Structure formats: structure tokens, C-alpha cells
Amino acid sequence: LDDFTSLHMIVVTARCNFNCRYCHASSANEKEQDLDLDWSTAKCIVNKIFESPSPIIKIEFQGGEPLLNWPIIKDIVEYAEIVNRIAKRRLEFVICTNLTLVTKDILEYCKSHNIAISTSLDGDQEIQNFNRKPRGLIDGYKVFEEKLALTRSILGQDGASPLLTVSKTNLNSLPLVVDEYIKHDFHGIFIRALNPYGNAVDNVNTLGYSTEEFLKAYKNALNYIIQKNIEGYHFIEYYAALLLERILTPFSTGFVDLQSPCGNIISGVIYDYNGYVYASDEGRMLARRGDKRFCLGHVKDNTWNELFKGDIAKEVVKASCVECLPECATCAYQLYCGADPVRYYAENGTFEGHRPSSSFCQKTKGALDYIFYLLSLNDDRINKVFWSWINY
């Protein structure tokens, strides 16, 4: 705990040039005003970040679409680098972007400052354009392909890492989604379920599915991915890889959902464009809909101790130790799992949650059940694939 917090997410704007059907962040139209991070607040955020005792500082730029406020990203990067001349931390940067606003100049800047790119890919052209709708008339998928090629030409083949969101649109075609990733020469996928925040709640009738449906699709996709590996194409399912690392090694993964106490605050924290600080990205998502239960304070009004060691922080940590939670305390999978008080709060209004009705609990148990089943087969081919994921 003395070395927390390493991941610092900064919302540089709440505006976006896309209107994704499941947008967890409830992003606003790109033409709206007063939703951008200003320099005065940004400087306070950077100063607060470097008060963290962690030897590693990762600053992740989020939105909205962060490239709509590109000047402030540059200001933060350059100021953080100046501060780090004295702080001497291992400093890393990531931009989470839909890629459409990426230019050669932006990518050259990213290359010179070692800024990584994270993006989103939900499937083929039809699925991508349905789930992730540009606010204009452009073909989002086509632009994604063009900008991915540009990104790789400057930052290298691994210059952009995609993230998948599973909705009803692609739930039953996950093997085809995997093929789409392979088509674009990616070597891994994180099969991530919808979360109960933002637009995903509004559109749950058209995008949602049961936990049982997700697990059925997940198992099918995992089998497909394993077979692809056996056939010679190295491709990781990152969620399974995280669970396997917990099961087969003595090491922690650093994945906030599989920590006890949870990674909220301890591992990662988010600073909104207006200077308010939240225990997690999901806490910020709730605040966009008016519920600021997980607000730790403001960078201009509160000290580091008030933010990170205040009552809310202590309450979140206290409620996320699986060793003390009902049912978790006696669960066979306790060693491999974690707790998510923000998710529990969103689902039923309490930090501790209710395990029998928790989709988080059901999903994690179901995934672990299947991974242990695959391990029990003692199939040399499958085991070889699993170890290749852990040692990657």
C-alpha cells in the first residue's frame, strides 16, 4: 500500500465525435462547450499525481475522445516530463482514442514521447459501425482501418492495442470477431462484457444479455482461440490469461477486478475534466449520471492525504477485501478473485453487494469453472497454449 497509486487516468474532455450505443462514459457531443480540461486544473492534477509514492507513474488520457483536446495532452506530457526530472519515476503515457482524429504529426509526437495508443475494435465493418457510431457521416470502420495503418507506419506494428466490448450485436459471433482481430494482425483479445454504466444502461434492451448467455459465448470463443493457437497462430485471450496467472503462478496480475482489496484508488484513480477525483473510472461514469458517491474530492481543494486516505477511500478499500465479504470469505475461488464495490453499488446500491445476484460474481465463477475444467483435461496441447499466454 505504501507504493500506490500507479495508474492515473485523466479525462481531458467529456466531448466525443462518436456516439457509441454502449458508451459507459456518457460522452457529450463534440460541439458542446465547457467540457474540456483547462491548463490550471491540469497542472494541479500533474502535481497531485507526483505526490503518489509509486515508483511507476502511468498517465492515461481518456474522454470522450481525448484528441479533441490535443493541446492539453501535449502540455501535460511536457510538464510531467519536467517534473519527472527531479521525481525520477518510471513515467508512461497512454492515449485511449477511436483513432479517427489521429494525424501524422500527432503520431510523430507520440513516438518522440513514448506515448502508447489504445483503441477499440468490436468486430467487422457492420458490427463496428453499428456499435460505434460516428456523429458525422463517415464510415467509422473504414477510417479505423486507415488510421490503424498510419499508426503502425509510425509507431510500429504493435503501436495500437484494441479493446473489445461485447454487446448483443457481436455476442454470438465472437469467433468472427477473433478472425477480425487476426485479419488486422493482432495477437490477443480481451473478451469484455458490458458494464452497467452510461448508455449501456439506456440501451440494455437492445445491447444486453444474461450472464449465462455471455458465459456460453465466452466458452465458445475461448475454444476457438485455443484451436487457433494449436494451429500455429499465437493469440491470447487476456481475461483467461489473467486467471491462469493467478491459478498457475504465485504472482498477482495487477488487474484491478482481481485484487483484494480491489484496485480502486490503490492501483488506479481518475481525474475528471473539471478537477474532481474519483475512486475508479466506473465511479466517474456514475458521476456523469449525477451520482458522485465515489468522488474523493477536488485537486484544487483537497490535499493528497484527503483524497487518497479520506473517508471514501477507506470505505471503498474496507468493502473490497474478499476475505471478509459474505460468501467470498468461504468461496473456493477466493484466491483467484477480487471485489468491485463500484459495480456492486451500481447493481444494488451497496458497497458489499449481493453475491447470488451479482453478474460480476457469476461471470468470474463461470470463467474459472471452465478454465479449471480445461486444466483437468490434462491435454498437452491446451496446457502448452495456456503457458504460452502466461509467459508471453
Predicted regions and their residues:
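Long, charge-rich, low-complexity alpha-helical segments
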Residues: 1-9, 179, 330
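Canonical Radical SAM [4Fe-4S] cluster-binding loop centered on the CxxxCxxC motif
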Residues: 3-39
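Cysteine-centered iron-sulfur cluster-binding motifs in ferredoxin-type domains/subunits
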Residues: 12-19, 65-68, 328-330, 334-335
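Conserved, mostly hydrophobic/aromatic
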Residues: 16, 20, 61, 275
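Detector for the c-type heme attachment site
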Residues: 23-29, 157, 332-336
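Radical SAM/AdoMet-radical enzyme domain recognition
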Residues: 42-62, 69-196, 200-210
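Radical SAM enzyme [4Fe-4S]-AdoMet core and its adjacent flexible, acidic
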Residues: 131-142, 149, 153-265, 270, ...
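Flexible mid-to-C-terminal extensions adjoining Fe-S/redox cofactors in radical SAM and related proteins
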Residues: 287-392
